[in-house]
């Protein structure tokens, strides 16, 4: 019986030692230690290779991109709309179709006067204002029926046509910008295609509703356009053209702050504005000169031809005059507030704000510094020296000029001549 029972523990030990079939070849100590080491090696080396084939795609990189791109590119719009950003600057990469982004907004990198090749041949700058802002009811901003032709809207793009149109067409709204797509954005929709100039008519591109007004008679009254573009604002009473373009320009400038005219060469109202600006400039210049003369107590006879000198030189001249008037009573008491004297060379008036030199040698006449040819440096030195005496060429040419003088306060004075 003991012989039969002895193999049983050996069988149990072999089953307990490990799962490998080679465990029975060694002793019990070897059977307990070696199978664990073999399992550790199998756990570190074996699973390292199967995950590469189970989870990773095939080693071909093209197949990797296909696996990653197919769920996205085939089901969405990236493949079909990828070439659009390069050809269409108005669309973003993630906007399907031609929707909201490109219809009413202008991207900052696009020129503001470029017409859209997809959303109609008119400009998109003023598109967010669908209702009229004009008191005459004509401020419809580029309706879809107001087309001039194909892309870039080259009709009236030539400046010569713009100039001719500004001379031949009389329009109530005369504050257009010089833009090929915006010259006729606010023309009343009556008198369609009535242009008296055949050259202009030959250059029109036929559109759906090209509305142009011909040179109207002086007594022709303006009728507001009908509500054909879905405008919610009722048309105001009619206004006669004989009221002139000035009132219309004023109304338009007050009613259209963003539509103020920045180009001064578009139409007749610009010419009138130029004339007004010139008149204002002339008036400002006259008022400026009159105020200056009033400040200086000078008669406004318009004989002043010399440019005015800087304020520092004028102050120095005034200082010189005041000093010398106090030093020399025989100078007839001239000061900065007394009337001016004529120049001894150019016979024009010598103002107090000009560089002037007094001939103290003999003739006691005033001379412009520019007329005498004296430089500013020499004039500054002469002005800084209170006891210096300057003589004109005529006085210095005479032999009877007293070259030596004796001053009561300052002693012998320096004799200066500018011949």
Swiss-Prot record:
UniProt short sequence motif Nuclear localization signal, positions renumbered to this chain: 35-41
Keyword Metal-binding in annotation: yes
Region (Interaction with BCL9): 373-391
Highest taxon above the source species: Eukaryota
Result after altering residue 357 to R: Loss of interaction with H3K4me2
Gene Ontology biological process terms in this record: canonical Wnt signaling pathway; hematopoietic progenitor cell differentiation; kidney development; positive regulation of transcription by RNA polymerase II; protein localization to nucleus; spermatid nucleus differentiation
Record's keyword annotation contains Metal-binding: yes
Subcellular locations according to the entry: Nucleus
Quaternary structure and partners: Interacts with BCL9 via The PHD-type zinc finger motiv, and thereby becomes part of the nuclear beta-catenin/TCF complex. Identified in a complex with BCL9L, CDC73, CTNNB1 and PYGO1. Interacts with histone H3 mono-, di- or tri-methylated at 'Lys4' (H3K4me1, H3K4me2, H3K4me3); the interaction is enhanced by the interaction with BCL9.
Stated name of the protein: Pygopus homolog 1
Lineage, uppermost ranks: Eukaryota, Metazoa, Chordata, Craniata, Vertebrata
